[in-house]
């Protein structure tokens, strides 16, 4: 059965429902103009519209947040001289990353690179156009003006992130990641070999790594 993916513009929740079902955000109950279609999915989420789908999203969010927290905790432990504790925080963070990946894959959220770039761009767009704009207004209303400015500052960063993802997506679609219309300086990300041309070599002549390791050199110093 085909399903449709939606984004709640009020709380940021994404969810899927069988095609033809009236969308209602399972988290905040928003409907109508507050719900945005993200993309149609060819039955890649067998849990669409169920409580289990909500539970999977909750589990994914919890594991993702735990991973970040443990990474921050590791930095504190390292600064305080607890190398072993720092390493264990990082090890556990990697465990949590894999747990989150399990639930993310169950939800059918992993696509190919072009699909992932589009999903990333849409997520960044929501953050800078809706989420941070709204939370900044609330912070101002409640007197937290410094925090409101931080929200707006991060929103500008998210805008740049969206632009970057869309530029990369255009390159992928145009098959212009490793070939350009103009002569470029290419650098091997593995060994640092430099070459000049409109196209990156199929393999690095120095370390034999494949073309996928090449990028346009962008030194700015």
Regions found by a protein language model. Give the residues of each.
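Non-heme di-metal
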Residues: 2-221
């Amino acid at each position: 059965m085909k399903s449709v993916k939606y984004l709640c513009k009020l709380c940021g929740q994404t969810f899927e429902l069988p095609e033809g079902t009236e969308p209602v955000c399972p988290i905040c109950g928003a409907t109508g103009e507050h719900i945005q279609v993200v993309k149609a999915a060819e039955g890649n989420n067998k849990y669409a519209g169920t409580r289990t789908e909500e539970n999977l999203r909750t589990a994914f969010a919890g594991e993702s947040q735990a991973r970040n927290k443990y990474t921050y905790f590791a930095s504190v432990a390292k600064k305080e001289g607890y190398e072993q504790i720092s390493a264990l925080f990082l090890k556990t963070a990697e465990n949590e990353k894999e747990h989150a990946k399990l639930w993310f894959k169950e939800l059918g959220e992993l696509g190919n690179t072009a699909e992932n770039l589009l999903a990333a761009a849409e997520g960044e767009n929501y953050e800078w156009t809706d989420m941070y704009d709204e939370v900044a207004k609330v912070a101002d209303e409640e007197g937290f003006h410094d925090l409101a400015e931080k929200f707006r500052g991060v929103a500008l960063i998210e805008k740049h992130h969206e632009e970057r993802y869309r530029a990369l997506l255009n390159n992928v679609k145009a098959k212009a990641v490793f070939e350009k219309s103009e002569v470029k300086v290419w650098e091997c990300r593995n060994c640092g070999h430099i070459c000049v041309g409109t196209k990156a070599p199929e393999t690095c002549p120095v370390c034999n790594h494949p073309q996928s390791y090449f990028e346009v050199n962008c030194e700015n110093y």
